[in-house]
Regions:
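Non-catalytic, conformational "gating/processing" segments within enzyme and secreted inhibitor domains
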Residues: 13-168, 188-271, 275
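Feature captures eukaryotic membrane-trafficking machinery centered on endolysosomal pathways
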Residues: 150-152, 273-308
Length: 308
């Protein structure tokens, strides 16, 4: 499991998670909640660790109980995550993140118009969407591969990061090459520029099984009935992870969203500021960033928008 999480040692990962939980208490726009619903009584050591991460522990009774928790913690945005509860299920681990932010610079509502968006693998045709538009100063960077812009929210040092690969690049190929080191370099290359930005207005809800993703990351043992080892929470080693479900709701509108370096100073005559244009009319990445968190862990939400 540690291999899947980037070879961090357990103590370091625990410290990072606690730092994130502490920081989230200061947020007014983002809420983080954890819960454990179990059909057996876990070991005391496990319960102590759960308490450290402010995770509630409840008796597992029904799918309705799980869905009610999700509905409450996401303010009604995710009302159901389970259709039914398998009789063999003995534990469910739950994590919920809820975010609602207002743009520091709101998009003018009268500037929103109907425009084309080209979905992934459907480039020959387009769908009509509401496209928001704004001309403002934002942190921005572009090169031959991509455009990246940062839109700040009004509170909590939160901002949205939007990365748009160039038209000739498949977004899935782009993501394969986008590691944390490259992302940090992109963030550092952004400068305050005048940007003519067009961004889709959208509301999405999507659900996915994460089993295959986690197994490919090296976290295969917990899913295997033979190799899974959860003796840290239960004396009898007779449990394993069956499924990991992620369900996400995302809304973006005009008001917001529910190393060597050389510096050269050149003095020249004043000129008209350069303006950049960024039209997000094809698949893109949407991230939520909190600058108060450790550098490699400041992205609290990451999503790929393929279809609108």
């Amino acid at each position: 499991m540690l291999l899947a999480l980037g070879n961090k040692d357990l103590e370091e990962l625990n410290k990072i998670n606690i730092d994130i939980l502490k920081a989230s208490k200061e947020f007014t726009t983002i809420e983080i909640a954890n819960a454990i619903m179990t059909a057996f009584t876990p070991k005391d050591n496990f319960l102590n660790v759960a308490s450290k991460y402010e995770s509630t522990v409840e008796d597992l009774k029904s799918a309705a109980q799980v869905n009610n928790w999700c509905n409450l913690k996401t303010h009604g945005k995710i009302a159901k995550i389970l259709e039914e509860l398998d009789p063999n299920t003995v534990m469910i681990l739950l994590n919920a993140i809820y975010f609602k932010g207002t743009w520091q610079k709101e998009f003018p509502q009268n500037a929103t118009s109907t425009k084309a968006f080209y979905n992934l693998n459907e480039e020959s045709k387009s769908v009509k969407i509401d496209m928001m538009s704004i001309k403002e100063r934002f942190n921005y960077y572009e090169d031959k591969e991509l455009q990246i812009v940062e839109l700040p929210y009004t509170k909590d040092s939160m901002s949205a990061i939007i990365i748009l690969p160039n038209k000739d690049t498949n977004i899935n190929d782009f993501i394969k090459e986008l590691d944390d080191e490259k992302l940090q370099k992109l963030l550092k290359r952004m400068y305050n520029e005048i940007v003519n930005l067009e961004l889709p207005k959208f509301e999405l809800e999507f659900s996915s099984l994460l089993n295959d993703v986690l197994i490919k990351m090296g976290m295969d043992e917990p899913f295997n009935q033979v190799t899974a080892d959860f003796t840290g929470m239960k004396d009898l080693n007779d449990i394993y992870i069956e499924i990991v479900i992620q369900k996400t709701y995302l809304k973006v509108d005009e008001k917001g969203t529910e190393a060597a370096d050389v510096t050269s100073v050149v003095i020249n005559t004043k000129s008209i500021p350069i303006e950049f244009s960024m039209t997000v009319d094809r698949p893109f990445l949407f991230m939520l960033r909190n600058k108060n968190l450790p550098q490699n862990y400041e992205m609290v939400f990451m999503s790929k928008i393929e279809h609108l």
